[in-house]
Structures are given as structure tokens and as C-alpha cells.
Amino acid sequence: GVRVVLFTGNHDMWCYDYLAQECGVEIVRNPRVVEFDGVKVHLAHGDNLNISGQPMLKLMNTIFRASGARTLFSWLVHPDLALKFGLWWSGKSRKSHNKTLMGVDNLRPLVEYAREHNLKNGDVEHYIFGHMHLPHYVREERFEVLFLGDWCGAEAVYATMNDDNNLKLNTFAIDETVS
């Protein structure tokens, strides 16, 4: 089979073990450094990284990620209402991360996170993030930062690494008949 790894982020931080047990999906909740052909790559969803200058977001993420809050929510809120709330919240977030409204400046906190991480761990050559739904490439002196963009919609964005260990953003047109 094909190994499937899901890096949880702001829309799936509450996923428990269903996908792991039923589908064999590996769930990753924190950034991870992996090695491909001797090249170290830092992989992360990107949510909740370098948000120290955003106290309300930090507080909200702390509450949403607390196991007690998740347990209370699952016991006290009917699943139909929880789904409606989740769809509303997701739509609100998606509108704030709209590609036409978001500029490259919004990517700066994650590029700064990569700089700080690279200063401490200088052997990482590539940083790959999702979260912002804006495909973009940043080349720094010692490393590259890649933002994958979306994986759904009219076209999916994915990354490849060539024989020279350089990353490249690619797109794949999604046929509307595929579901």
C-alpha cells in the first residue's frame, strides 16, 4: 500500500485515531524533520507556529488544543450542532485565508520560524508548510521554504525534489468528475 501521513492543523486538530485505525493513516501532530536521500526536510502543517505576537490566537489555540475542552465539547455538544459549528468556523477561517486577500507578507511568521529553527538546527535544507493555502517559494542563503497551497479545488499543489535536492512547486488539475 501507499503510506499516507496527515499533519494535523487548525481544521483537524481534534482528529482522534479513527483514520489511523480504519485507514492506516499516520497522524502527525507536531513538526517533524525527516531525511530524503540524505537531505533533511522540516515538515509541518504550519498552524500554531511563531504566533507569539498574536495573544488572542495563542489563547484560542491553547483552549482548542486542551484535552479537557475536547472532552467537554464531545460530551456536551450534539454531533449535528458540532458539525454545523465546525463548518461555520472552517468557512470563516477559509475566507480569512483567501488567496486573493492574502499576500506574501502573511507568510512572514513561518519564514521567520524557519530562520530561527535553522539557526538552532543548521543541517535542515528545506522547510515545507501548508496552512496558508498560498503556494509560494522562498530561497534563503542556507535553506528553502515552500508553502504548498491547496490540495483541493480546481488544482492541487504539491512539491517535488530534483536530483540536485532543489524543491519545486507543481500543480495537478483536478477533474471535477473525480470525487
PLM feature segments, named:
Residues 1-179:
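Extended recognition/assembly regions associated with phosphoester-bond processing machinery
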